[in-house]
A protein has these predicted regions:
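A structured, charge-rich N-terminal accessory region that forms the first stable segment of a protein
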Residues: 1-59
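A glycine-rich, hydrophobic loop/mini-helix early in the fold
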Residues: 38-108, 115
Length: 331
């Protein structure tokens, strides 16, 4: 008989659907409660609006990280594991991969325009993010009757493995929920957390697998995808009896120590105008360039630029100066 594993992953910024009315930057109240209520109303209105396209969540998110997430199911076939996929969304809260959602922009990543904590200064950003997640858990969401928190998943499946794959910014938001969920499991060793770059969190350290950029060469892909690629490796290679926090921490801790040091690049920062000129010249030579490929080339040429900044500059030039149909601008 196959063994069920509940997998919780965080959403991605890249999506197949867009909707300007569902961008958190447009809900600028400095009061958390007011902002959340306005956001919730907008989502409910979108659900009732037949002109706004909705898709299953699994098909809304995209990008290299999400491509790996979509391989989780096939990765478990030979191990006779059955997975149930859940998504932590800063916009919709906890949803299943089958939940019908619209395109939206909301995130717990503090550097972005649609950050949950942006513009709210009454308390610390960490507390704001926790409060936002708590508010989302109390909303019915797009699937009536389905779990709206990680704790609710555990209460429904107390004996099953819970694998949480997240970024550090999302770990902070869902931290209280995770601590409560851990205590609700029949065996706390069944909670496994993979959060690249985050080694410890109070009360959860015994559940957190070691994962950082040293795994990149072994797992392949971008460094930022190490957490989902490690999850894929575990799902495809480990027998169900070995998927518990204690065994995996020991095994992958030793494996991580065997990896070469993280490569350091001595790349040069240049002014924004020079970055734009670089993008412009390359697009003039090749109109089929994607932002992803051009950023890779830019870095290979010895220059440094954060992904989101480069993408924004790329899209700005694309829209204003070239009016080109760029095939792929996701990272």
């Amino acid at each position: 008989m196959s063994r069920l594993i509940n997998i919780v992953v965080t959403c991605t910024d890249s999506k197949t659907l867009t909707n300007e009315s569902l961008q958190l930057r447009n809900y600028s109240s400095s009061d958390l409660t007011t902002r959340f209520q306005a956001w919730k109303k907008a989502l409910n209105n979108a659900t009732d609006d037949i002109s706004i396209e909705h898709k299953a969540a699994l098909d809304v998110y995209k990008g290299s990280i999400w491509s790996t997430v979509k391989r989780f199911d096939s990765a478990t076939k030979k191990n006779e594991l059955q997975i149930k996929l859940w998504i932590c969304s800063a916009g919709y809260g906890l949803i299943s991969d089958k939940a019908k959602i619209a395109g939206y922009k909301a995130t717990f990543a503090r550097s972005q325009d649609d950050s949950v904590a942006r513009g709210i200064s009454s308390t610390s950003k960490a507390l704001i993010e926790k409060a936002w997640w708590k508010a989302l858990t109390k909303w019915d969401g797009p699937e009536k009757g389905e779990p709206r928190s990680i704790t609710a998943i555990v209460k429904k499946f107390p004996d099953n493995i819970l694998l949480v794959v997240c970024s550090s910014s999302y770990l902070n938001a869902i931290y209280d929920d995770l601590v409560t969920a851990q205590k609700s499991l029949t065996n706390t060793d069944n909670l496994i957390i993979i959060c690249a770059g985050k080694e410890k969190a109070k009360g959860l350290s015994d559940n957190m697998l070691p994962c950082d950029g040293r795994f990149q060469e072994l797992l392949g892909g971008a460094r930022g995808a190490s957490n989902v690629r490690l999850a894929e490796k575990i799902l495809s290679e480990e027998h169900a009896d070995n998927i518990n926090a204690d065994k995996l921490i020991k095994k992958y801790g030793e494996l991580l120590e065997q990896q070469p040091p993280i490569k350091k690049f001595n790349r040069k920062k240049i002014p924004e105008q020079e970055i734009k000129e670089y993008i412009r010249k390359n697009l003039e030579r090749n109109q089929n360039l994607s932002a992803t490929k051009l950023l890779r080339q830019y870095r290979d040429d010895g220059f440094q630029c954060e992904q989101k900044r480069f993408r924004d500059l790329f899209n700005s030039l694309n829209e204003k100066n070239f009016n080109l149909d760029i095939k792929d601008n996701s990272f």
